[in-house]
């Protein structure tokens, strides 16, 4: 039996279940079990910390949390997100056909390719330009994080880095990461897909955040 539900379309919904075919799920202080269909809570292109937050927001909605409570938690999450280092705001991808596109570009100059491939090749190029012999080269099949960049002398719009790279080089950390663009991809789009149909004032969580940042005199620059 379900206690409450969020129904977006016929094949996209979530229910808070307290009786799962005779097994009680609302015991030991737990609210029940969330059954979700088609909501992309665990998409591989979503960072784990965002997956966890989406699940948290969904549970609040299913537990009949008020709009203000949910918007406050989103505002707080935005603040935490902004304080993260730029490279932690990227999107996970799997690098495919890197070798193929690198060879293609060597033959014919600039070639069209998927964004995550371009970002991976940009990492390899910057690694060479910085005479970095220690960081891993991105090759086919590697898991990478793709980060968006602000305007820069190289004209790059994004750069990837290997998930397994334990010591990110300083030349990489110093790149001009575009936190606002990544916030839109990671937070705005994902929340819009999940709770957009509820017509909550998600825009207000941005305005509140900007206001708080402007008047947070105790914070560091």
Where are the model-predicted features located?
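DNA-dependent DNA polymerase catalytic subunits
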Residues: 1-221
